[in-house]
Amino acid sequence: MKIVTTVQEMQHITKELRASGKSIGFVPTMGYLHEGHATLLRKAREENEIVVLSVFVNPLQFGPNEDLDRYPRDIDRDENVAKENGVDYLFYPSVEEMYPAEQTTTVEVVKRTDVLCGKQRPGHFAGVATVLMKLFNITLPTRAYFGMKDAQQVAVIEGFVADFNIPVIIVPVDIVREEDGLAKSSRNVYLSQEERKEAPHLYRSLCMAKERIEAGERNAEIITTLVKEYIETYTKGTVDYADLYAYPSLQVVDQIEGRIILAIAVKFENVRLIDNITLTVK
């Protein structure tokens, strides 16, 4: 595995690889890698001749009162996970390397961002789309891999790749969970011992809602109310949102039909956790 820290070198490598006909699987991350990231890397390894992993904590996608400075970082751990999962190139640029001067252009996302995390975090998805535009141009991937834990992000990325005719295949990958159902996340380290015991109830609330839908409930408000009440009963967390939308358009639905997403965000003392399920309802 080769570690690359400059845009120029990474671009030179990927241009040569693509010119020689090699397929490139790209996994963009902010580091502090866990089994969810490893799953993305293994899928990229299966489907491509070359695997590129980026580790970059992107300041553009953090708001003024968010956890940019304390976002967990451990490059030694990340290198080990990368090596264990078949990464060929680890792209690890500094902020100064990625943003050497003030940005004159950013990517503004105009759809699919006024709900869920986009509503709570204005500017977040503009930051995500801007850094991905840069990373796609640097790594020139054939395929790029994203976890469905950030399902809104996947919907936004699919839209922006289509809008700008970017020649990359977006590959969504199912959420990876702990044995008790908690979605794996770099931010889970912020949970207290008691909160960690409560956190699996987030996924249980979604499973309960899924059972109700499969049993015939089609009223979106009844389902989201059920989820909120369950989380408020079984955890000390504060429900930021529990919402149901058409997916991937993220349009409001009153009656549940077609492909939908049920998504939640819950604030604990030192961390905000998200989770979701997507399902197709006939």
UniProtKB/Swiss-Prot annotation:
It comes from Bacillus cereus (strain AH820). Pfam families: Pantoate_ligase. Catalyzes the condensation of pantoate with beta-alanine in an ATP-dependent reaction via a pantoyl-adenylate intermediate. It is an enzyme of class 6 (ligase). (R)-pantoate binds at Q61, Q153. The lineage of its organism: Bacteria, Bacillati, Bacillota, Bacilli, Bacillales. This is Pantothenate synthetase. The keyword Heme does not apply. It comes from the Bacteria.
